[in-house]
Every structure is written in C-alpha cells, then in structure tokens.
Amino acid sequence: MQCALYDAGRCRSCQWITQSVNEQLSAKTADLHRLLAGLPVEQWCAPIGGPEQHFRNKAKMVVSGSVEKPLFGMLHRDGTPVDLCGCPLYPASFDPVFSALKPFIARAGLTPYNVARKRGELKYLLLTESQFDGGMMLRFVLRSETKLTQLRAALPWLRAQLPQLRVITANIQPVHMAIMEGETEIYLTDQQALAERFNDVPLWIRPQSFFQTNPTVASRLYATARDWVGQLPVRHMWDLFCGVGGFGLHCATPQMQLTGIEIAPEAIACAKQSAAELGLTRLHFQALDSTQFATAQGETPDLVLVNPPRRGIGKPLCDYLAQMAPRFIIYSSCNAQTMAQDIRHLPNYRIQRVQLFDMFPHTAHYEVLALLRRSI
C-alpha cells in the first residue's frame, strides 16, 4: 500500500507498510505458531486476509487548528498536529464528510480544543460507516455542553450536505486527558443506531458499543465461527464478552438456547434488537460482567464462546471454565499472547483447530479464532 503520509514521515501508525501483505501474513502466522508452541494443535487452518486499503469503517480524528481552519487527524507527542484525511485506510466515502465538516465547524462555532492551553470545545470527531447501506454515524466529542445550542442550530445545513448521516450525537468528555469519549451521549437525531448486516445477519451499531473496524474480515470471522459451531452437537451455548452479539447471532439456531453477556448496556441493546429481528426467541442477552455471570451459574452449556478484550479472560474465569468443563470452548482474540496464556490455564482442553484473521493489515496485530475440545 502506498501512503504519502508515511513517505513524508508524518505518520508511523502502519509500521509494517513497507512489507508486502504476504510477508505480513507469514510473519503473523509465525508469531502465532511461536505463541502456541507446546500446545498441541490438531488443525492449522489457512489464514484469512482482506483488502490492503480503504477497509476501515471508522475514523477517530483529533480536532486541532482553529475554528476557521480546523485540522482532523492526530497529535504527535510534542503537540504537532497531522492531517489524516488522506489516510489510505479510509474509504473514499469519508472524503466528502471531512470536506463538509470543515466549514460546518465554523458555522457552528465549535472551537477546536487546544491541549496546551486547555481551552476550546471540540476534541474529536468519530465517524462510522455501515457497509450494508452506506449510512453513517457521526459523534462530536465536546468538552462541555456550552456549544450544544449552536450545534443543533447548524445541523440542518450539515444534514442537507450529507444525507448519509443517519445518527449524530454529542459526547461530553470534560477531562483534560487523552480519553476518546465520556459517559454522556446526547442524541441529535431521532435514529439512535446504525444498521449493519454481515452474512444476512442484522447488526446494530450504537455510539458507545464496540464494533470491528474491518467489516470484510470481521464478516468472515463470524461466518467461520458459525461453520465451526454448526459441525458440533451444541444445544446450549454461552457467548461471553458478546458485544453487539455478532458471534451469538451468527451461531444461534431456532432450537439452540443461547445466553450472551456483555458489560456495556449499549451493546446489549443492539444485540436484543437483532435477535428480535431474526425471531430467535431462545436468545437472551444481558448487560453483566462476563466473569461474574459465569461463576454464578449452576448449569454447564455445551459450548462457551469468549471474545474478550486484549487482556484476555484471566485466570479466575479460566479456572472456573476448567472446573465447569463445557465440552467445547471457542476463543476469539485480538491478542494471541493473552489467549495463549489463558489456554495454558485450561489443561484439560486441546486445540482442535485455529485460524488467523488479518483484521489489522500493515501492523503486527491480528485476530485469531481457536476451537478447544475437552480431552477428558
């Protein structure tokens, strides 16, 4: 992938950009083999790649500069701003949005936040696009509610320029820290969730719910999990750290009893909406801590699927799963190092198959899916 920002030395986020995609996949595969060394693997499935560029469905832009000439991108550690509107990871459909937002900021009087002076209102712009219908969600991350009236008054102009904006919010983040969002979300549109669809499964994206940033590879990840579960005798399944329900909604059948657990209420609201659309009445999603939920249960499902954050599921949940002893565990991870640590805390399980998904091209990161079968 060619990137003018990288060539000019202005951005180094894609640290592997000088390597070919095949070289990157080989290096990531070797890393996964290294991390799982000593753990018997029955089947290594071929790695899954995706597009080299224009694949991201989300932009997280620091806003700097002035109200008349705002700049969208990032700040180096010394405070130097870098315009990332031309980042080749973004789809071309983002270009008109960035172009319209620059004059809009002046219209709304949204002064960019100055980190050094601790002054200004607009901190970030968060843009998400649905690959299903091209609809977009735009979030203005503000220091306070001071400019809300002006923002609301100027919105008709922006929506006339960009009818693809379905969901618009103001997120209030008052803390002088590099935190992307605050707890308060104020909806500026009637629609509150963005419709997405992977493999004919309806999904919903809300402002504070996690959603994969590479939809092409994510859809293949979910489809693979569905295929694996479909080959197993599963009538009762848990989907822990379920997010908006992507895995559970793909794997569920009308006869299956499935419980999805996620600590974020916004994500659970999305999962419930999708389950209702699919008519799956035996799916139950709850906003709870996954470890606390699991350790409080007296029943053992046939399969437990876990999709934890980078820190992994941790030893307490590993110990409980080992004691509870479901027949199968599917582990989806964005950090193979913590996944390998967790699997080593499950001594009575063998890795039946494992597959790498190149969710994050041009970086050292990748997603991995592993199917574990109880050996005794």
Curated annotation (Swiss-Prot):
Its EC number is 2.1.1.189. The keyword Transcription does not apply. Pfam families: tRNA_U5-meth_tr. Belongs to the class I-like SAM-binding methyltransferase superfamily. RNA M5U methyltransferase family. RlmC subfamily. PROSITE patterns: SAM_MT_RNA_M5U (PS51687), TRMA_1 (PS01230), TRMA_2 (PS01231). NCBIfam families: meth_trns_rumB. It catalyses: uridine(747) in 23S rRNA + S-adenosyl-L-methionine = 5-methyluridine(747) in 23S rRNA + S-adenosyl-L-homocysteine + H(+). GO terms for biological process: rRNA base methylation. S-adenosyl-L-methionine binds at residues 212, 241, 262, 307. Catalyzes the formation of 5-methyl-uridine at position 747 (m5U747) in 23S rRNA. This is 23S rRNA (uracil(747)-C(5))-methyltransferase RlmC. PANTHER family: RNA M5U METHYLTRANSFERASE (PTHR11061), TRNA (URACIL(54)-C(5))-METHYLTRANSFERASE (PTHR11061:SF30). [4Fe-4S] cluster binds at residues 3, 11, 14, 87. The active site is at 334 (nucleophile). The gene is rlmC. GO terms for molecular function: 4 iron, 4 sulfur cluster binding; iron ion binding; rRNA (uridine-C5-)-methyltransferase activity. Keywords: 4Fe-4S, Iron, Iron-sulfur, Metal-binding, Methyltransferase, rRNA processing, S-adenosyl-L-methionine, Transferase.
